[in-house]
Amino acid sequence: MRITISGPPGSGTTSLARYLAGKHGLDLISAGEVFRQLAKEHGMDLADFGKFAENDPSVDRMIDARQKEIGEAAENIIIEGRLSGRMVGNADLRIWLSASLSCRARRIAGRDGMDEEGARAYTENRQRSEATRYRNYYGIEIDDLSPYDIVLSSETFGVDALGTIVDAAIACLARQQAADL
């Protein structure tokens, strides 16, 4: 089974992806972790690296091509990333997580050791940067959620509850796929 998990920064995509990968024994590819590692390798914070990526399309294209290639070749995998639901053409289940900006800023502040106001400004800038890049590189409007099978609020539900909901969807898909054989 191929599952993609997408959502804005701080929405909990990595937490849900790790939960599901552990529970179901699936491999996990995280575009965000690849992006963070590249930023570190370039000696930049994420905001500066995002600006760099706006002027160097090869950064996004490399990450996106890699997740597409891996996601479409693998059988039992979770691909977590902002565009994974759009890039992995043969995904069995596409999930989008949402949460308010204030909720996501609190999470990012806690995760990255920032004050909440700084995390909010950082998150808004990052979202603008990503939206610009995705529109310019791929013609994608990131706020269009039509490619996703499930849209869930990680502000309403914690990772265990989200996992339970997605577990039910996975079970339904598995039954459906078995019946189609």
UniProtKB/Swiss-Prot annotation:
SUPFAM superfamilies linked: P-loop containing nucleoside triphosphate hydrolases
Gene Ontology annotations of biological process type: pyrimidine nucleotide metabolic process
CDD domains per UniProt: CMPK
Cellular localisation: Cytoplasm
Enzyme Commission number(s) of this protein: 2.7.4.25
Catalysed reactions, as listed in the record: CMP + ATP = CDP + ADP; dCMP + ATP = dCDP + ADP
Enzyme class: transferase
Domain of life of the organism encoding this protein: Archaea
InterPro entries: Cyt_kin_arch (IPR011892), Cytidylate_kinase_dom (IPR011994), P-loop_NTPase (IPR027417)
Molecular function, one GO term: dCMP kinase activity
Keyword list, A-Z: ATP-binding, Cytoplasm, Kinase, Nucleotide-binding, Transferase
Residues where ATP binds: 7-15
Pfam families: Cytidylate_kin2
A GO-annotated cellular component: cytoplasm
Family as reported in the entry's similarity comment: Belongs to the cytidylate kinase family. Type 2 subfamily.
Protein name: Cytidylate kinase
Name of the coding gene: cmk
